[in-house]
Amino acid sequence: MDPEAANNGEPRRITSVLNAVEIIDAIKEHRGITLQELTTELDLTKATIHTYMATLRQVGIVEQDGDGTYQLGDWFVPVSNYARNSTDLYRLGREEIDKLATQTRHTAHLVTESDGRQIVLYESMGEESVTTEYHLRMRETPRKLHTSAAGKSILAFLPEGRRETLISEIEFGTESSTPIGSPDALREQLATVRDQGYAINDEEEIHGIRSIGAPIRGRTEDVAGAVSVTAPKTRLQNAEFAGEVPALVMEAANIIEVRLETA
């Protein structure tokens, strides 16, 4: 247990669980890591980490390659599938994402938000989709909302207090490749998103990649998630980028809103 948390009136925390989560996060972030690398990165002794790894291996949470590198184990596959499949947004939204990918011929995403980051629940590839490491990173690594069109569309419609809290946590110019230079510049973008109903990412994160995102909203200020379309700049330009695709993205988001409301 964490005695300091108890003394401060906070819920008690089991330190061993927190340590295990740190180890799992490190393996995920590095896409494989050695015992020595874990010892360098974490504030734990080599012997302690070795004990954790032996336990995690025993239950299938981690696996060890022949060269000694630890990877996440197959234990996560059914667990993550269950977590995703049990959400109403995934169950009621994926059909519309498939339709959107067919209509636009590009890659469509269904995302939700957790702790100020976007999580990809579902991805559908259109006939002109280009599979890239970018899409893989989107699925595997939750990113701060301001770094993508889908994320900005969520951020724009969050309650003002929470939106301002998330903006205050951004280290502008250091933690992402987006060219948004200041909190005020981001606020101006988000005001435009609220006015037009959708957000764009015009090569802000990846050179040559454009995307359009629209929020999935409820009756109140709640934002369930967002819909987005992503494509190479040469395949998403002019009339498509200015009106046709945004209209389809907003339509898909609205249909999912209706399905969530009437489920």
Curated annotation (Swiss-Prot):
PROSITE patterns: HTH_ICLR, ICLR_ED. InterPro entries: GAF-like_dom_sf, HTH_MetabolicPath_Reg, Tscrpt_reg_IclR_C, Tscrpt_reg_IclR_N, WH-like_DNA-bd_sf, WH_DNA-bd_sf. Residues 89-262 form the IclR-ED domain. GO terms for molecular function: DNA binding; DNA-binding transcription factor activity. Keywords: Arginine metabolism, DNA-binding, Plasmid, Transcription, Transcription regulation. Probably regulates transcription of the arcABC operon. Residues 35-54 bind DNA. The keyword Transcription regulation applies. This is Probable HTH-type transcriptional regulator ArcR. One of its GO terms (biological process) is negative regulation of DNA-templated transcription. It comes from Halobacterium salinarum (strain ATCC 29341 / DSM 671 / R1). SUPFAM superfamilies: GAF domain-like, Winged helix' DNA-binding domain. The gene is arcR. Induction: No induction in fermentatively grown cells. SMART domains: HTH_ICLR. Residues 14-74 form the HTH iclR-type domain.
